[in-house]
A protein has these predicted regions:
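Flavin-dependent oxidoreductases
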Residues: 15, 175-180, 184-269, 273-284, ...
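N-terminal Rossmann-like FAD-binding beta1-loop-alpha1 element of flavoenzymes
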Residues: 2-29
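Helical element adjacent to the flavin cofactor pocket in flavoenzyme catalytic cores
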Residues: 138-196
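Glycine-rich FAD pyrophosphate-binding loop
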Residues: 21-43
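C-terminal catalytic lobe of FAD-dependent flavoproteins
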Residues: 253, 262-263, 274, 279-403, ...
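Dinucleotide-binding Rossmann-like beta1-alpha1 core, especially the glycine-rich loop
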Residues: 46-126, 255-256
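Short beta-strand to alpha-helix junction loop
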Residues: 55, 62-65, 90-99, 138-157, ...
Length: 481
């Protein structure tokens, strides 16, 4: 029997697993998909929010600010890309300046540092490419940007290095209550037992919650699937803005943003549409037109559409309380929900890990893990290495001299590292998220066949068994001759 089973290997589940590993406990993470970071964590804005938007006193407010404070040190310890570029919330009408003041005061209540309301002139000096229609803005210098894949993967790898076991392709199908603990049924008729269950299943967390019969203290949960569509521009467009540019938030979120990414691209989006299908991550012509139209409100001129290298959609889980739901069930001891983790969930993830670990430690008193490793060595990227480092890497392994992805300058050595790391890549998208091979201008048109070949060789399976992402994403069916 495990001490804890975490259901879901997104950024929330991986952050929780890492924090739980600070104690001497047996931890298992079950992930329904073929890899970690396959749900909401892979399709979002990559923003480290300052914390002025959430209502004071809410879990969102508390954990957003704490997560923001943790991010810089974590980025150094776990070696994932992060930049504190600051954010601006634009106001376009004189009569709405009062709403900026409300956000400012809310941020002060939440403990956000350095907030300023900028005049139109100050705004122009800071961001010359913004529209002339912006009359004022709230500036949050503690806002930032992060790579959501790298953050999630870093958390998972560090958790694994500290003894956490990850099982992928293990969709949970049922949960039984035992006399002491829970029995979890998963794919391939696998059965796991644990004293404590952490439900971090993202948009499917309500389904996991509802696997336990409703009774006093454990009512049925319902999450709303809210879809957001994005456009990602080539790195040529990445310098359009330096700060993350928001518009005044509305009922469904923070509106359409314009932001650089930590890798130098330009990102615009998302829309916010409630949909019935939790797996409905298709993009639509209408949605992408909305993104470009509304992003154009913030900047003088968007780059031409031909510089868009990809578009994508993600689903976030919205709870009717408009807050995170993080609590032990009052009807089932040791069953902890971590649900409704929408924006600012990415920012809050490290703090959610701390918060949930405190809940678990109150239930389950165990000694400290004296061998806990705080740091993680990231993948060394040839593009970022200096000449001497490149020579050293190639001398150690000639695969570093074999360039696989031309757009992002990713070598075979980096791909090998991604495959053979803890919780390593087993799919083409898994390699992409760990190395950026396939993330560039051609979107894998050149390197994907080579990545398939490398995965097949290193994993010892036929190329026909290599998938793009999940089990049904077949890439090759057989020989043509």
């Amino acid at each position: 029997m495990y001490d804890v089973i975490v259901i879901g290997a997104g950024v929330t589940g991986c952050s929780i697993a890492r924090e739980l590993a600070r104690k001497e406990r047996q931890i298992l993470v079950l992930e329904a998909s073929s890899d970690i970071c396959e749900g909401t964590s892979k399709a979002n804005s990559g923003i480290v929010h300052a914390g002025h938007d959430a209502m004071p006193g809410s879990l969102k407010a508390r954990l957003n600010v704490r997560g923001n404070q943790m991010m810089g040190e974590l980025a150094q310890k776990l070696q994932f890309p992060y930049r504190q570029n600051g954010s601006l919330i634009l106001c376009f009408e004189e009569e709405n300046k009062g709403k900026l003041q409300e956000l400012y005061e809310r941020g002060i209540q939440n403990g956000v540092q350095g907030l300023q309301i900028l005049t139109q002139e100050e705004l122009r000096k800071m961001e010359p490419n913004l529209t002339d229609n912006a009359v004022a803005a709230l500036y949050a210098p503690t806002g930032g940007i992060v790579c959501p894949f790298s953050l999630t993967i870093a958390m998972a790898e560090n958790a694994a290095e500290n003894g956490v076991l990850f099982q992928r392709n293990q969709r949970v199908t049922a949960i039984e209550v035992m006399e002491k603990g829970y029995r979890v049924h998963a794919a391939d008729e696998n059965v796991y037992e644990a004293a404590i269950i952490i439900n971090a299943a993202g948009v499917h967390a309500d389904e996991i919650h509802n696997m336990l019969p409703a009774k006093e203290g454990h009512q049925e949960m319902h999450l709303i699937a809210r879809k957001g569509e994005y456009c990602l521009y080539d790195k040529k467009a990445g310098a359009l803005v330096d700060k993350t540019i928001f518009q005044l938030p509305g009922k469904y979120g923070k509106g359409i943003l314009v932001t650089p990414t930590v890798h130098g691209n330009l990102l615009i989006g998302p829309t916010a549409v409630d949909i019935p299908d939790k797996n409905g991550v298709n993009t639509t012509g209408e949605g992408l037109e909305t993104v470009m139209e509304k992003a154009s409100v913030s900047v003088k001129k968007l780059p031409p559409a031909k510089q868009i290298i990809t578009s994508f959609a993600g689903i976030r889980a919205h709870h009717e309380s408009d807050d995170f739901v993080i609590e032990e069930s009052k009807g089932y001891a040791g069953f902890i929900d971590v649900a409704g983790i929408e924006s600012p969930g990415l920012t809050s993830a490290p703090a959610i890990g701390e918060y949930v670990a405190q809940l678990v430690n109150e239930i389950q008193a165990l000694p400290d893990n004296k061998d806990f490793k705080e740091t993680r060595q990231g993948i060394v990227h040839m593009e970022q290495a200096d000449f001497e480092e490149k020579q050293k890497l190639i001398a150690q392994n000639p695969a570093y001299a074999n360039m696989i992805c031309r757009c992002e300058s990713i070598s075979e050595g980096e791909i090998l590292d991604a495959i053979h790391r803890p919780v390593g890549a087993t799919t083409v998208d898994g390699v992409k998220r760990r190395t950026r091979a396939g993330m560039g201008r051609c979107q894998g048109g050149f390197c994907s066949p080579k990545v398939v070949t490398i995965l097949s060789r290193e994993l010892g399976v036929p190329m026909e068994e290599i998938r793009k992402s999940d089990q049904d994403s077949v890439m090759l069916y057989g020989d043509t001759k």
